[in-house]
Amino acid sequence: MVNKSPRELFKVPAAWSITQIMAGLTKALDGTGPALAFGPSNFTQVDPEIAIVMPTSGSTGVPKEVALTAPALLASATAAHKYLQAEPGQHWSLLLPTNHIAGVNVLVRALSLGTQIVESNFDFTSIVPTQLYRALHHDAKLLDSLKKAEAVLVGGAAISLDLLDEARSAAINVVTTYGMTEMCGGCIYNNEPLGGVEVQVRSEGRIALRGPMQAREYLGVNGPLADEENWFITNDAGYLAGEKLFVIGRTDDQIISGGEKISLETLDSHLNSEYDVEFMSCAIPSPEWGQSLCLAATNYFNIEEIKEKIRRKFGNPAVPKFFLENVELPRTSLGKPDRQKLANKFEMMYP
């Protein structure tokens, strides 16, 4: 008889070492220990099939709790290793936090290769564009390690073509990745779907994905994670050229800066409720951050005060990089924020 009793959900302590996390993750995957929550959770139990619970990345939006099964996590690792032609005994290095799926994926991949995480002389690692930029411009030690690696996965945010060219010119074998927590992280490598991954681009340009690494559900959310044909409908827009997927941006008001999602509408609403000045945010391309957050207002304001208020409320990733004061905020004919027109103004001011 199949055991359908709930499984304990254990919140991974911040003080745990990588060795402790790996031990707990091993038991979560093979079913001999509790499921693990890699972030704040409102739950203490989950269905027995669930191995880990991950918060969706986000500093201004409300994170959802994504429930992932062991078969999904292992399918993701297997597909990644097949693409990378990885072999048992090769090593991964962890350069990302474990409260993001990309960090946990590194641990799962190491376990599937039968090795421990190493800090140097690694074969593979996963980073965000900001880390790659800093390696090329500031961090000689990291740069040396990346150049020696067989492959360096870069995802979590859009990477500029200039940064990609610079990295490859420096002899770093960059593999660009696209995915999300709901698909166990990256499932598109160098614009190509990993094994078992299916891609659609709907009529409105919205990307839809499905595959064996798909998440089971959002905890505490009524309704399915996917549609009736098990397609996960993303908030990203893109197009297909043959078998390759090209992502061109978001369909909502979110941006990704330094690997963190930021809701522009949430940020604006908070500031506009706190001040008599009207604020509007937007983003411009950045080789270091992927996208740099910008903030404009209809009057003058204390920039340092605003930065500190945003930092306390939403965290460091949501602090704007550029400011414009006492300007007219552009709007569409329907009265909605025209963020693209505002971004054009910032690009002229901060080329």
Give the ranges of each region predicted by the language model.
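Conserved AMP-binding A3 loop
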Residues: 50-78, 85
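Conserved ATP/PPi-binding loop(s) of AMP-dependent carboxylate-activating enzymes
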Residues: 193, 202-230, 250, 260-262
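Conserved pre-ATP/AMP-binding loop-to-beta segment of ANL
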Residues: 38-55, 88-90
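AMP-binding/adenylate-forming
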Residues: 67-75, 91-141
